[in-house]
Amino acid sequence: MGIYKYIREAWKRPKESYVRQLLWERLQQWRREPAVVRIERPTRLDRARALGYKPKQGIIVVRVRVRRGGLRKPRPKNSKKPATLGVNKITMGKSIQRIAEERAARKYPNMEVLNSYWVGEDGKHKWYEVILVDPYHPAIKADPQLNWLCTGKHRGRAFRGLTSAGKKGRGLRNKGIGAEKVRPSIRAHGRRGK
């Protein structure tokens, strides 16, 4: 069994392996850090490599902290009936992972989001690591596995739901019966929203 398989098996059930102790120590430090932090190397090397990470120039990894649970919606200032305030029990149309990807993309506007993966959570927050690629870097332009990101149509892909997490949230993992209203997009089909 190779090293990546050992790492993968340990992270499948983090509460039952050595990952539990690692997370307990790491989360204490991560809570004190800013919401978006650039890191030197991936925490989950197996997952990062599977999603396209390579240790080369033009690729960075960023750890993002996002809130857990439903939307924290501000309370309207004008008087309304409590029933119509629409503050509690509001579920976002976007997943928390997508929010993390967008925040990383805003922090690094010259880079594009390649993919992201979960690295930890506590009662209040979730942490994701986002792989970012510089589409203008010569090393990326020369890489046959990554140079597809250099074309203009992939600009701002995190904001348009074109990452893996974005496509999942838009329902594009399904096709056939039950997925009639998903394509060409959620907005296009009768503007039913998400």
Swiss-Prot record:
Q: Where is this region: Disordered?
A: 164-194
Q: Which domain of life is it from?
A: Archaea
Record Gene3D superfamilies: Ribosomal protein l15e
GO CC terms of this entry: cytosolic large ribosomal subunit
> Which GO BP terms sit in this record?
cytoplasmic translation
What are the entry keywords? Ribonucleoprotein, Ribosomal protein
Q: Where is the composition biased (Basic residues)?
A: 184-194
Any one GO molecular function term: RNA binding
What family name appears in the similarity comment?
Belongs to the eukaryotic ribosomal protein eL15 family.
The protein's name is: Large ribosomal subunit protein eL15
